[in-house]
Regions:
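Peripheral, non-catalytic segments flanking oxidoreductase cores
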Residues: 1-325
Length: 325
C-alpha cells in the first residue's frame, strides 16, 4: 500500500458490492495514518472546471471588493490574506479564502451563522458553492460511515452526529509567491473537524507527513478522486484510535509555478455542537466534558480566527501572531 494514500470506491460501498473490501481498505488507511483517495464521488470533470472558473472570478474581484464580504467571527464570507496562522507556526499562511457555512443548521445550535454572497458581482457563485457543499458533505459522511464500521462501531455512529452540524466549505486562493516571500501557502497542521474532503486542486503542493518516517510525501490530485483525511475531532472522540493526519501546502520550487495562483475547494465535516468528544478532558476546568462546540472555538482561537480565549480552557496560551506576509 502506498504510504501517502489508499483508494476507496464509494460505489462499491454504497451499493453493497465489495462493501467488506472497502471497510477493510479504510481500516488499513487508519492504521497507516494516510490519506484516502475516494472514487465514485459524483462530480463530473465539466462541473469541477466550471466551479473553478466561477471561483477564479470571485477572487479576481480584488481585496477592496472582497472586504465588503468580511463577517465578524470568520465563519462565513471572505477571510483575508494572512489572517489564518497554524498553531505554533512562525508566519501566517499565504492564502485568502471564502467560507460557506452549513445551510441546514440544527435547531439546537446556539452559534448560528448565515452565508453571504457576492451576488452583484458574481451571481453564479451562490449556486455553485452550495452545490459543492452538499456534494462534498455526502462524500465525507459516507467516509465517516466506513470509518465507524472499520473500527467496529455502528454505521451511523459518527455520521448521524454531523447532520445539521457546523460543517464548512472553504474555497481557497493561494496567490503567486513573490521572490523573498516568507512563510508557505499552508503551514503543517491537522484539521479541526471529523473528516475533510478535498476536490481536485488547481496547482500542486499538498504534502502528507509519513508519521512512520518523518518524510513529507506529495499528494497528487485528479478529477476522478476526492482526497479525504481524518481530523482532530474524530481523533478525540475515538481516544486516538482514528488519528488525524498532518499535512501542509508548500510553495513551488519552479519559478514559473511560483508566479501562478493555486486554488482549492475543501470541505470540513463537523459534528453538531452538542456532541461530546471526551467525557472528561484535562484541558477543561474540573476535567469536565469536551464538546464539539468547545473544541471548535478553542482551535479557532489558537489559529487566530477568533479573538476570544475560551473561559473554560486550562491549557497554554496560543503562540503570538506573526508578522504579516
Amino acid at each position: 500500500m502506498n504510504n501517502a494514500f489508499v483508494i476507496v470506491d464509494l460505489d462499491d460501498f454504497l451499493t453493497g458490492e465489495g462493501r467488506t473490501r472497502q471497510i477493510q481498505i479504510v481500516k488499513q488507511a487508519i492504521e497507516k495514518r494516510c490519506f484516502v483517495r475516494v472514487r465514485g464521488h459524483g462530480f463530473t470533470h465539466e462541473g469541477i472546471d466550471y466551479a473553478y472558473e466561477v471561483v477564479r472570478r470571485v477572487f479576481a474581484l480584488g481585496v477592496e471588493v472582497l472586504n465588503k464580504y468580511v463577517v465578524p467571527g470568520n465563519q462565513v464570507g471572505y477571510i483575508g490574506f494572512g489572517k489564518e496562522k497554524a498553531d505554533g507556526a512562525i508566519y501566517p499562511d499565504r492564502k485568502e479564502f471564502w467560507q460557506v457555512y452549513q445551510p441546514d443548521q440544527a435547531e439546537t445550535q446556539t452559534a448560528k451563522f448565515y452565508n453571504i454572497w457576492p451576488t452583484d458581482e458574481v451571481p453564479e457563485f451562490e449556486g455553485v458553492a452550495l452545490d459543492l457543499f452538499y456534494r462534498l458533505q455526502r462524500v465525507t459522511q459516507a467516509m465517516l460511515r466506513l470509518t465507524a464500521l472499520a473500527i467496529g462501531l455502528p454505521e451511523e455512529h459518527f455520521a448521524e452526529g454531523t447532520v445539521g452540524g457546523s460543517s464548512i466549505a472553504r474555497i481557497i486562493h493561494y496567490p503567486p509567491v513573490p521572490d523573498g516571500a516568507v512563510g508557505i501557502r499552508s503551514e503543517k497542521h491537522t484539521d479541526i473537524n471529523h473528516g475533510t474532503g478535498l476536490l481536485t486542486s488547481q496547482g500542486g503542493g499538498l504534502q502528507l507527513l509519513d508519521h512512520s518516517t518523518g518524510e513529507w510525501l506529495p499528494v497528487e490530485h485528479d478529477y476522478d478522486h476526492i482526497v479525504f483525511n481524518w481530523a482532530d475531532m474524530i481523533q478525540a472522540a475515538t481516544n486516538g484510535q482514528v488519528p488525524s493526519v498532518m499535512h501542509r501546502v508548500v510553495n513551488p520550487d519552479d519559478p514559473e509555478l511560483r508566479s501562478k495562483p493555486r486554488f482549492s475547494i475543501v470541505f470540513f465535516l463537523h459534528p453538531r455542537e452538542e456532541i461530546v468528544l471526551e467525557e472528561s478532558s484535562d484541558i477543561v476546568k474540573d476535567n469536565g466534558p469536551l464538546t464539539a462546540h468547545m473544541f471548535l472555538w478553542l482551535r479557532l482561537w489558537q489559529i487566530w480566527l477568533s479573538d476570544t480565549r475560551p473561559a473554560w480552557y486550562t491549557g497554554p496560551d496560543r503562540a503570538p501572531q506573526a508578522i504579516a506576509v
